[in-house]
């Protein structure tokens, strides 16, 4: 289902190692696009390239939705069972018991397990319960920058409007636009910008201001983002936060992994890779013990 708040993912060596360890790397490469360089779009229309490494070295662009669906398919093929549209409101840590219900105030059903891994994201319910334990450290910092998804469609003949093997960046000081390719030769673009201030989401209140802003700062996008106005005012402005906590485990019953343990901003390109690296460590521990 379209959410209008997606940032394409970038897979680097940290992530590939985790997938190789569990035998999923070849299947995931099939849905990725190799990206060997940055394409830097300057305000005067010039285009510069910065290669990431030696010839043949590349990171991979992955659609978040496509990756999620592929990972579910691969897991189901190995016998993993998924339950969708289920709401977990609380957890009893000592017994690894989840509490499920339709509403936070309604009747809950008890679900007991041997172990629970909290992979429930930056605003984790599992971590929220762990925060009430003594000696549990937690910090949360919201950035003053938000983001909004925009879209570059493929041409009518299916060809891409810009180079699919580049991570496209339009750097403009304290705000920027970036774009990564999808399998259908479209691009998912993300506008990162302050929430408030002179050049901010707060300041772009109507079509005239938006079109003028893009004409001034991103002039070469005029012909490649045909639905700029629709996308900008339809898609939500989302927020960015850094979250840290420790410890990530409770006895031998509960463990946090991924963003529930360590959410970071997307600029480093390592949020997903750090999450997969948790699986590298988990897999090593499973082999050891």
PLM regions and their residue ranges:
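Active-site-adjacent segment of FAD-dependent monooxygenases/related oxidoreductases
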Residues: 2-74, 78
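A generic "binding-loop/recognition-motif" signal
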Residues: 15, 34, 87-88, 122, ...
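Short polybasic amphipathic segments
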Residues: 37-42, 95-101
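Short glycine-rich anion-binding loops that position phosphate/pyrophosphate groups of nucleotides
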Residues: 45, 121-123, 270
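Conserved FAD-binding catalytic core of PHBH/FMO-like flavoproteins
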Residues: 73, 77, 90, 98-240, ...
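A structural signal for the hydrophobic beta-strands that form the central parallel beta-sheet
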Residues: 82-84, 118, 256
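Short loop/edge segments at beta-strand edges and connector loops
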Residues: 84-86, 92
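Conserved mid-domain beta->alpha element of the FAD-binding
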Residues: 150, 236-289
């Amino acid at each position: 289902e379209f959410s209008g708040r997606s940032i394409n993912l970038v897979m680097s060596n940290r992530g590939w190692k985790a997938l190789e360890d569990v035998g999923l790397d070849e299947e995931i490469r099939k849905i990725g696009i190799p990206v060997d360089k940055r394409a830097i779009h300057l305000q005067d229309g010039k285009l510069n390239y910065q290669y990431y490494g030696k010839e043949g070295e590349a990171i991979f662009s992955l659609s978040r939705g496509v990756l999620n669906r592929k990972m579910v398919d691969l897991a189901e093929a190995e016998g993993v069972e998924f339950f969708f549209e289920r709401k977990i409101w609380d957890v009893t840590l000592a017994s690894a018991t989840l509490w499920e219900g339709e509403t936070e105030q309604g009747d809950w059903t008890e679900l007991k397990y041997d172990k629970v891994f909290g992979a429930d994201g930056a605003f984790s319910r599992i971590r929220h319960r762990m925060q009430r334990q003594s000696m549990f450290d937690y910090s949360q910092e919201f950035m003053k920058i938000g983001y909004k998804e925009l879209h570059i469609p493929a041409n009518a003949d299916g060809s891409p409007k810009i180079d699919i093997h580049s991570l496209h960046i339009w750097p403009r000081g304290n705000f920027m636009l970036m774009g990564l390719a999808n399998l259908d030769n479209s691009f998912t673009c993300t506008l990162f910008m302050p929430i408030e201030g002179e050049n901010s989401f707060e300041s772009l209140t109507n079509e005239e201001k938006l079109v003028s802003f893009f004409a001034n700062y991103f002039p070469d996008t005029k012909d490649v983002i045909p639905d700029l106005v629709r996308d900008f005012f339809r898609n939500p402005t989302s927020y960015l936060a850094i979250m840290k906590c420790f410890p990530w485990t409770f006895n031998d019953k509960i463990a946090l992994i991924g963003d529930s343990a360590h959410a970071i901003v997307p600029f480093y390109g390592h949020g997903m890779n750090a999450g997969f690296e948790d699986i590298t460590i988990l897999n090593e521990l499973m082999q050891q013990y």
